[in-house]
């Protein structure tokens, strides 16, 4: 019986304890594909300095959300759910996954690291991998960096890969986001039954920011963020704005920032704000700390009520989206025998 192509989910990773915060930050800031800290020979020394200076404050933030990042546990749960629905599929002629598909997880900046997972997969007999980055919108700083590291490692093991670069406007992914938004709007009374409009609610799409230099060099990230939003607002008639969060490092970042946008909306008289973390597919420090704690407190001080839509995590609709993306990838790779 032929061995089906395995699936590898790639994600950022996050510290699994408070003690892991500083080395996680060092790994993050050491990557020139995410942020360039002077000449290349100074990257690691500057990364060490920045990670040491930021570790204390970052540890305080993680201590408020359980003492670690939940991204590892959630990503493994997503992998388990995806593996289950893939193995319910039958009929390889139609492009469905054959019985026995395995879904693994690898992280860019913390365990399980890509460089550790790949040799384990090879030892287990894996020779073909469908690679799915859990960043819906492509950027050289996220998906690009992860895939470059993966290619570097797989080259030593003879594993053939097919990488899915982005899926920012995949219909089932959009449906999952829209469902999450509809659920989130219930806090404010839901949608109008007649017009499908949210009454007195302003939606703020908040995406992870990116150094402006990447966009100037042709990175499609911002365009794909807007593409995701365009697909959403075709399904829900809502007033909305777009902002960017999680800036870090001494460079110019894409704006407007989320805190600036909240202040601007408050000045316009907006009272009810529903935040949609549009570039994230799971909970981590950006949702649980930045949005749920910092931005929520800021909004309250400005006389606003801020709520966040639930992250996709293992939402059944989202898992079905991942399944469809993977199955189409198997077809495109020519591995649907």
Predicted regions and their residues:
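Active-site-proximal alpha-helix that buttresses catalytic centers in soluble enzyme cores
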Residues: 1-337
């Amino acid at each position: 019986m032929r061995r089906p192509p395995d699936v590898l989910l790639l994600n950022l990773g996050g510290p699994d304890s408070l003690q892991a915060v500083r080395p996680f930050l060092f790994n993050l800031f050491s990557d020139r594909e995410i942020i360039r800290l002077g000449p290349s020979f100074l990257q690691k020394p500057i990364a060490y300095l920045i990670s040491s200076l930021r570790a204390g404050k970052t540890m305080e933030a993680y201590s408020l959300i359980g003492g670690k990042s939940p991204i590892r546990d959630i990503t493994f749960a997503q992998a388990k759910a995806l593996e289950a629905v893939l193995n319910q599929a039958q009929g390889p002629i139609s492009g469905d996954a054959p019985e026995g598909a395995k879904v693994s997880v690898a992280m860019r900046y913390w365990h399980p690291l890509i460089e550790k997972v790949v040799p384990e997969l090879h030892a287990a007999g894996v020779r073909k991998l469908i690679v799915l980055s859990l960043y819906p919108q492509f950027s050289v700083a996220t998906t690009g960096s992860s895939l470059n590291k993966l290619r570097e490692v797989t080259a030593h093991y003879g594993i053939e890969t097919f990488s899915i670069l982005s899926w920012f406007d995949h219909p089932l992914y959009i449906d999952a986001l829209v469902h999450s938004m509809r659920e989130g709007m219930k806090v404010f009374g839901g949608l109008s039954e007649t017009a499908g409009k949210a009454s007195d609610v302003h939606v703020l799409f908040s995406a992870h920011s990116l150094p402006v230099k990447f966009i100037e060099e042709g990175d499609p990230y911002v365009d794909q963020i807007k593409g995701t939003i365009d697909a959403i607002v075709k399904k829900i008639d809502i007033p909305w704005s777009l902002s960017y969060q999680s800036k870090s490092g001494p460079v110019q970042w894409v704006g407007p920032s989320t805190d600036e946008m909240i202040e601007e909306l408050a000045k316009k008289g907006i009272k009810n704000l529903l935040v949609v973390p549009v570039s994230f597919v799971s909970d981590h420090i950006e949702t649980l700390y930045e949005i749920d704690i910092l931005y929520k407190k800021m909004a309250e001080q400005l006389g606003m009520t801020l709520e966040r839509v639930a992250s996709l995590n293992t939402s059944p609709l989202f898992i079905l989206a991942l399944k469809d993306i993977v199955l189409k990838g198997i077809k495109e790779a020519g591995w649907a025998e």
